[in-house]
Amino acid sequence: MAKTRLYLVRHGKTMFNTIGRAQGWSDTPLTEIGERGIHELGIGLREAGLDFKLARSSDSGRTIQTMGIILEELGLTGQIPYTFDKRIREWCFGSFDGGYDGELFMGVMPRVFNIDHVHQLSYAELAEGLVEVDTAGWAENWEKLSGRIWEGFSAIAEELEAAGGGNALVVSHGMTIGTFVYLINRTRPHGLDNGSVTVVDYEDGKFTVACVGDMSYREAGAKVMEEEVEAR
């Protein structure tokens, strides 16, 4: 049986990413620059000769848009199974969804915990802090948040393994992918770039992290695009 491997992609850069707003369960489309970055990624994955057996994304518009571009570049649109899974959505920031990142992560949360920077908090502390400051009651506590993220990615791996293994292309979100990595090996990645690739292997019911935030596919695709422009 082939190795079971998940290629976890952070969606392309959106309007809210560009102007520094917390996106969470709210949604904005990819910008022109964001779309170009994902075309680069798709070309890079194609040039690497990777074969994908199935595709999954969250049910957010930005991940669906990202997946559409990648599948187009891979020539796989309509060729492999593709479904949405709300369990691999981004964290919900509750009443701060759509607010400026700085307000939440450099203002409210540091004041609540009396710290200098939000990176001093564990994911669990951050989740519980969001629940505390969320006036809408939408934010998820750590148990619920970590549980649905683990279940979402595990379901993909288990389905793929049952089908004989292979590669799955999964488009999700920065903090969601970071949380999954943390749940596997208790390391917390910071600043996963848009269009980055995190690779996770699954065997005998266990996950291992092969790489985090790899930008080499995008870089390779960008080089191909530049060469095509120069050749015109």
Model-derived features: positions:
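Loop-to-helix element that buttresses phosphate recognition and phosphoryl-transfer chemistry
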Residues: 7, 13-69, 138-149
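Acidic, low-complexity terminal tails and accessory targeting/binding regions
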Residues: 2-4, 91-103, 107-113, 158-166, ...
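Short active-site segment of divalent metal-dependent hydrolases/proteases
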Residues: 14, 176-177
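Phosphate-coordination/substrate-recognition cap region in phosphate-metabolizing enzymes
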Residues: 42-117
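A mid-sequence, solvent-exposed acidic-amphipathic segment
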Residues: 135-164
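Short glycine/proline- and acidic residue-enriched helix-loop micro-motifs
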Residues: 110-144
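Beta-strand elements within well-structured catalytic alpha/beta cores of enzymes
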Residues: 5-9, 56, 163-172
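Active-site glycine-centered loops adjacent to acidic/histidine catalytic or metal-binding residues
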Residues: 11, 87, 173
